[in-house]
Amino acid sequence: MEQEKILIQKKNETEDEILRCALSLFVSKGYFNTSLSEIAQAAQLTKTQEIYDYFESKQQLAATLYNSIIDSLSVSIDEIRRRNKKASEQLHSLVNLLFKLTEEAPNALRFLLTVNATEFLPQEKLFLQTPAVNKMLKMIQLGINNGEIRSLSPMLIYGYFFGIINTTLELILNGTLDKKSELYQSQAWLAAWNAIAKK
């Protein structure tokens, strides 16, 4: 039984390493320019075939990555919504999280913001159709209902608010804004909030 636990743990560690290496390669080279042999080499596997012990294809590997990142974001949003009652507090906490991710998980954020996943994952939901975005829209609707946010379509408000936030994050991630992300965070928050706040 102990041997089985060790094998399962080792399998999970290897799978995580494959995912981590694939993520890094997908955001630096692009999905189509990344081969399974490059992923295997980066993950220090002895043979490319070993990837098939964990994933049926490169596309399934990418889908696992995409869904894992979306699910993690969705869980974080649930926690933010539980801790904060006002929409402004929820959105501010979400912005804090996203800026923190530029330092702690930049490749995951790059994968969400800059990689066009629909090109190679046509069967997956568009980011705007995921539970994570649906929860963001609920934050916005809460703010509209409570009079904090202008009374416009929640998706339009999403576009105004996250247009500013996501563009700032992309500029940080690609090095155009070359200082620490925290130096841009309050300015981005104020610009985004002022674009949607009810005056």
Language-model segments: residues:
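Hydrophobic core segments within long, regular secondary-structure runs in both alpha-
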Residues: 95, 99, 133, 137, ...
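Hydrophobic/aromatic-rich alpha-helical bundle segments in the mid-to-C-terminal region
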Residues: 109-114, 144-191, 199
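Amphipathic alpha-helical packing segments from all-alpha helical-bundle domains
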Residues: 71-74, 78, 121-146, 155-159, ...
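N-terminal intrinsically disordered/low-complexity leader segments
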Residues: 1-13
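Helix-turn-helix
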Residues: 25, 29-60, 64
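Generic hydrophobic, amphipathic alpha-helix propensity
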Residues: 14-23, 39, 65-69, 73, ...
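Short secondary-structure transition hinges
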Residues: 99, 103-137
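Hydrophobic alpha-helical connector segments
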Residues: 64, 78-104, 157-161
